């Protein structure tokens, strides 16, 4: 299936624009000018539609690659995001190293929202991949959510719930880096458009932290570029790319 069928631009150009927008914290108009400098004439409203269509798909396809190898000590917190002039709550989790675990956008801050967030973060994890320690602020919603997940068997009974403020410093710092990406938006139009865009931001943040490095066949940014392209079936397969790199290596060594 061609994900870019009917588009006026190639998949490579579209992913280039979406990846840049989600990675570098620039406005749609600035990105329009940057692409124009490279001979690509596209309106900023078209770039917006690309981000809405492909950012969440990019996060979905890359999720398997970056959601691996977490430390079992997690940090949970929420930050604020403006949607239609009102504050929404972006729940986020990282491990003690700062690697992104998961996120969830909610219009409310409640035990129900906290449970949905934690349930999403735990979904698909084997028992041995689930956290042994959860650090949160003192909001009672987290305690209620954790207790309910334990009763449902989704968290082990011995999972420790801590409320140590300084342990969340790594997550607070990560909030700040995400806010740099969100700032040019100047407020989202709706919850669906906000969530779609944030999914792209979070996916690019995870790649930038090196969470998918084992699956990047080339070093640096080009490894990430090719991983994104392969996720959409663009360019050579991983096997072909590996064989090409090996051939070049032995040719240069000869």
Predicted regions and their residues:
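Short, solvent-exposed beta-strand edge segments and adjacent coil->beta transition regions
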Residues: 100-101, 131
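Short conserved beta-strand segments at catalytic cores or DNA/RNA-binding microdomains
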Residues: 84-100, 110, 118-122
